Regions:
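Active-site hotspot residues in diverse enzymes, especially metal/ion-binding acidic/histidine motifs
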Residues: 1-123
Length: 123
């Protein structure tokens, strides 16, 4: 997997995960289980850059790939645990340790340079 949104959309398609662009009132992105499949919604009008689209889509794929879902009644610690799992999946796929080591060895040593190199947001 590379760090371009088109590659992430292709990954989702191979995994039978529906990805749709939908305007939403509050959320920028969300994912839901649908029986034996998953669906992701992204609000393209809230995505300010390719890096943000990449990070949001990877995060939602992380929910799908780890089965980390919760409902509105879940306790905050449960929600955070599921969000952390999705973040961990996204980070491991967007910034593999070996590639991070190579980037640092090649001179990408600060957060802005690394985020640009990996096409991810700084946060």
């Amino acid at each position: 997997m590379t760090n371009h949104p088109l590659d992430l959309y292709a990954y989702a398609e191979r995994r039978n995960i529906d990805v749709d662009w939908i305007p939403m009132r509050r959320a920028t992105s969300l994912s839901v289980p649908l029986g034996d499949r998953y669906a992701i919604a992204l609000d393209p009008w809230k995505l300010g850059s390719l890096a943000q689209e990449t990070v949001c889509l990877a995060h939602e794929l992380g929910h799908c790939e780890t089965g980390s879902f919760y409902n509105q009644y879940a306790a905050l610690d449960v929600r955070q645990r599921h969000e952390n799992r999705a973040d961990k999946w996204a980070i491991q796929h967007l910034i593999p340790v070996e590639e991070l080591d190579e980037a640092v060895a090649d001179g990408c040593e600060d957060i802005p340079a690394l985020s640009e190199h990996f096409c991810v947001t700084e946060d």
